[in-house]
Regions:
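NAD(P)H-binding glycine-rich loop region in Rossmannoid oxidoreductase-like domains
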Residues: 1-16
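Short-chain dehydrogenase/reductase
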Residues: 13-17, 55-79, 118-126
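Conserved Rossmann-fold NAD(P)-dependent oxidoreductase catalytic core, especially the SDR/UDP-sugar
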Residues: 18-68
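Glycine/proline-rich active-site loop of Rossmann-fold NAD(P)-dependent oxidoreductases
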Residues: 76, 100-110, 118, 136-153
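Conserved beta-loop-beta element that borders a ligand/cofactor-binding pocket
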Residues: 76-102, 147
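Mid/C-terminal beta-alpha module of Rossmann-like enzyme folds, strongest
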Residues: 131, 135-209
Length: 215
């Protein structure tokens, strides 16, 4: 995943695409492949740059990968691998940025590869884990019918987690007792495009099925 994927693009392609191919092959090789259900986690990066005024997105929007984003390329090809594999019941969930306690320790140049006026609907690490748990439990209970499977969904923690990158930088720096980004960084240190991030117009669809938002 990013940011390691930016440093090792060829290994990223081999890992993400190869893993998808291996999983599909293993499922289809079982004596009961039609009984096996598969969930693949995609990424918001597949739809690329979505700065204002096209900052609201949904599954079904054109795939538009940012230049040099090998991670998004690998995830898109892997996603297609599952969809076209012949597996009877698959679901694709596209993950957003994950909020987790140690996010401040992730020091990498990617912090400047984010448009300061861009947006993102984040998902907490707790909601992400709850999503996977509830997927298993709801399916086991027979609550997920054919209207759920063989579709794409966006993963987000909802309207409370829709925020501009500028606001996010202010919050992060504020936890360290520092001033806003305009006091610490030069504006031209940040890119103005060629990244990814959006608010989800269809984000509630997955919540209505799996009820994972609690943060």
């Amino acid at each position: 995943v990013s940011p390691t994927a930016d440093w090792k693009p060829y290994k990223t392609q081999k890992t993400n695409i190869g893993a998808a191919q291996s999983i599909c092959k293993a499922v289809l090789a079982q004596p009961n492949p039609d009984d096996i259900k598969v969930c693949y986690i995609g990424t918001v990066a597949e739809t690329g740059d979505r700065n204002y005024p096209i900052h609201w997105g949904r599954c079904g929007d054109p795939i538009k990968i940012s230049i040099y984003d090998h991670y998004a390329i690998s995830k898109t090809v892997a996603e297609r691998t599952f969809v076209e594999s012949g597996i009877k019941n698959w679901v694709v969930m596209r993950q957003s940025g994950i909020l987790y306690p140690n996010i401040l320790k992730n020091m990498d140049p990617i912090m400047f590869h984010v448009p300061i006026n861009g947006v993102l609907e984040w998902c907490t690490v707790e909601d992400s884990g709850r999503l996977m748990c509830n997927l298993v439990l709801e399916d086991e209970a027979g609550n997920l019918g054919s209207d759920f499977w063989n579709h794409f969904y966006n993963i987000g923690s909802g309207k409370e987690y829709r925020i501009s990158n500028y606001e996010f930088e202010c919050l992060l720096l504020g936890t360290l007792g520092l001033a806003g980004p305009e006091k610490l960084f030069e504006p031209n240190w940040f890119i103005t495009k060629n990244f990814h991030g959006q608010f989800y117009a269809d984000g509630d669809k997955l919540e209505n099925y799996l009820h994972f938002r609690e943060n």
